A protein has these predicted regions:
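P-loop/Walker A NTP-binding region and its immediately flanking N-terminal helices
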Residues: 1-172, 176-178
């Protein structure tokens, strides 16, 4: 049996299971219920506060075939594929190791394609503050005029390293220490 980190094994799969971030989960659920989901989010907070987990839950919730009170059902075809990592419409990128202009340009090309199964293509860019200046400039063009079927969730521990032009195009959520 392979080793699985505890944070992966016991990662919350609904907003309700997320601990200590009710001010954020309530807002996100209300946006989903009202069908008023933004095109770009910035999740900011220290390590282990739930940024990436919230991004994954949000990506599933907005694509879920049978959402319940703003939560993903985690039972439909889309949710199951997303949980297993098989859904190509939810793309996770670690900007610490994929921080070049070329990496972002490939995203810019991909956003023109419609999702294959889900309603939205969701790009989760973790440690976004690690992008190069050129990569930020390339990302900015997509954030300014994103296609209807694309959502971005940027996660960072250091928002002060992000250009003001990126910050101004995202809904910012500050995660509290738990």
């Amino acid at each position: 049996m392979g080793y699985t980190a505890l944070y992966r094994k016991f990662r919350p799969i609904t907003f309700t299971e997320l601990v200590g971030q009710e001010h954020i989960t309530r807002t996100l659920r209300n946006q989903i219920i009202a069908n008023r989901v933004g095109h770009a989010y910035l999740f900011n907070g220290g390590r282990g506060t739930g940024k990436t987990t919230s991004a994954k839950v949000l990506a599933r919730a907005i694509n879920c075939l049978t959402p319940n009170d703003g939560e993903p059902c985690n039972e439909c075809e889309i949710c199951k594929a997303a949980i297993s990592g098989a859904l190509t419409d939810i793309v996770e990128m670690d900007a610490a190791s994929n921080n070049s202009v070329e990496d972002i340009r490939s995203i810019r090309e991909e956003v023109n394609f419609l999702p294959t199964k889900a309603k939205y293509r969701v790009y989760i860019i973790d440690e976004v503050h690690m992008l190069s200046q050129g990569a930020f400039n390339a990302l900015l063009k997509t954030l300014e005029e994103p296609p209807e079927h694309v959502k971005f969730i940027l996660a960072t521990t250091e928002p002060q390293k992000l250009p003001a032009t990126i910050l101004s195009r995202c809904q910012r959520f500050d995660f509290k220490r738990i």
